[in-house]
């Protein structure tokens, strides 16, 4: 499978083998009806890179492929009409729409069942590993009513597929996986919530530097629906804004960030002390708390901090939990207070 984008004769894109699913970056030129492409990131003189010479025809694109080792193969590509590719798995919901290339990349994945474990003495989960990436995720087996389990697992599967899309779409300069880690780093299940964190680190071809992130998901164990942070801990007045809307951005900037700093100063005065130089982690800055990750855990709601590139080591401190006592005062209907 291949996708190409043309900007004034400069072509960029990627392709993958169905056997591996991993993106291999492409770059080159379009001259008239002909493409001259290479899997090199920075220049055509790199060793062990693939080369393609392709020509557009009525029924697709044809040409020749030469591997880095010199092996030559014919190429015969057929255009897939936009929107013709079905979803990789029915019923999943992604934070952004997948294009046809990504849908094909996620199609026909296989998952090997792994160990089962009991969480909290009651809730049974089973782990599954995707065969190509070796990335693992759990699904809920028992502990909640069957219809709720189905909804919970739909949210988990949606996250899993979206993370796999990111994995296959990130390659290093040789076309091998650019993702170093992608794993569940924490999970919490009780009679009211299913919550987990996913840690990710990567260095994709063409990027200026490696990066890492922590993502969180929390699900209502009564309904099986995904919860936003505003569903759990709302500090505003009136109706809650839609996530990522202008009103939500304003709320996060003017209300949420400052309120979290005020609360954390009371809960963790030592950790929130202002730093005396430019090299410290300034957790007293409301901006670093506005858009961080969050999840529920034994200690309460974890709120992550997000710093600029030069201070990334300060991201997501271990201590920044809002206890359930505070959450109950804010949202007694949800937390049984």
What residue ranges belong to the model's regions?
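Central antiparallel beta-sheet cores of small beta-barrel/beta-sandwich binding domains
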Residues: 1-58, 62-65
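Short consensus segments that form the blades of beta-propeller domains
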Residues: 16, 205-210
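Edge beta-strand at a domain terminus
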Residues: 18-34, 60-100, 211-218, 222
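Short, surface-exposed coil-to-beta transition loops
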Residues: 21-25, 47-50, 180-182, 210-215, ...
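A short, surface-exposed beta-strand/turn
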Residues: 28-30, 212-227, 317-336
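A short, structured loop/turn motif at beta-sheet edges
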Residues: 29-34, 55-57, 185-193, 218-227
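Active-site acidic/histidine clusters and adjacent loop/turn architecture
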Residues: 82-195, 199-203, 291, 296-310, ...
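Short helix-loop boundary/capping segments
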Residues: 216-279
């Amino acid at each position: 499978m291949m996708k190409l984008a043309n900007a004034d004769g400069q072509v960029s894109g990627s392709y993958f083998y169905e056997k591996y699913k991993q993106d291999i970056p492409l770059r080159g030129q379009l001259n008239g009806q002909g493409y001259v492409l290479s899997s090199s990131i920075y220049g055509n003189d790199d060793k062990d890179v693939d080369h393609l010479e392709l020509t557009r025809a009525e029924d697709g694109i044809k040409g020749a492929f030469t591997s880095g080792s010199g092996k030559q193969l014919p190429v015969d590509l057929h255009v897939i009409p936009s929107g013709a590719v079905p979803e990789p798995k029915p019923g999943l919901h992604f934070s952004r729409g997948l294009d046809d290339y990504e849908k094909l990349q996620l199609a026909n994945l296989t998952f090997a069942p792994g160990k089962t474990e009991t969480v909290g003495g009651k809730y049974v989960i089973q782990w599954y590993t995707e065969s190509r990436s070796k990335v693992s995720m759990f699904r809920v087996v028992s502990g909640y009513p069957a219809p709720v389990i189905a909804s919970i697992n739909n949210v988990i599967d949606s996250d899993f597929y979206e993370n796999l899309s990111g994995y296959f779409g990130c390659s290093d300069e040789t076309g091998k996986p650019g993702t170093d880690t992608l794993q569940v780093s924490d999970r919490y299940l009780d009679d009211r919530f299913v919550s987990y964190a996913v840690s990710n680190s990567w260095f994709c071809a063409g990027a200026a530097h490696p990066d890492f992130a922590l993502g969180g998901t929390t699900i209502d164990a009564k309904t099986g629906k995904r919860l936003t942070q505003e569903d759990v801990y709302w500090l505003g007045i009136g109706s809650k804004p839609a996530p990522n809307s202008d009103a939500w951005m304003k709320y996060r900037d003017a209300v949420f960030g400052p309120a979290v700093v005020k609360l954390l100063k009371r809960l963790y005065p030592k950790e929130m002390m202002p730093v005396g130089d430019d090299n410290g982690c300034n957790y007293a800055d409301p901006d670093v708390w506005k858009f961080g990750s969050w999840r529920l855990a034994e200690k309460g709601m974890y709120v992550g901090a997000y710093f600029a590139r030069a201070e990334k080591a300060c991201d997501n401190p271990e201590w920044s939990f809002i206890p359930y006592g505070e959450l109950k005062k804010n949202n007694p209907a949800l937390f049984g207070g």
